[in-house]
């Protein structure tokens, strides 16, 4: 929580300039670089990564 106050973002993406305060946010961001769509609608062609 304290990192939010000081602007420290030690978790950095190795594929772009994104950085964040915790590892779970970085893991969520890394999905944006993936071509894997985990969630698909059973009734149509809609799919999303997260």
From Swiss-Prot:
A zinc finger (C2H2-type) spans 1-5, 11-33, 39-50. One of its GO terms (molecular function) is zinc ion binding. Keywords: Developmental protein, DNA-binding, Gap protein, Metal-binding, Nucleus, Repeat, Zinc, Zinc-finger. SUPFAM superfamilies: beta-beta-alpha zinc fingers (SSF57667). GO terms for biological process: segmentation. The keyword Zinc-finger applies. One of its GO terms (cellular component) is nucleus. The keyword Zinc-finger applies. It is found in: Nucleus. Its main location: nucleus. Gap class segmentation protein that controls development of head structures. Belongs to the hunchback C2H2-type zinc-finger protein family. PANTHER family: PROTEIN HUNCHBACK, ZINC FINGER PROTEIN. This is Protein hunchback. It comes from Schultesia lampyridiformis (Firefly mimic roach).
């Amino acid at each position: 929580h304290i990192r939010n106050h000081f602007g420290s973002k030690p978790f950095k993406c190795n594929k772009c300039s994104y950085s964040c305060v915790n590892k779970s946010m970085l893991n969520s961001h890394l999905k944006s670089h993936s071509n894997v769509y985990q969630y698909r609608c059973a009734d149509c062609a809609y799919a999303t990564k997260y």
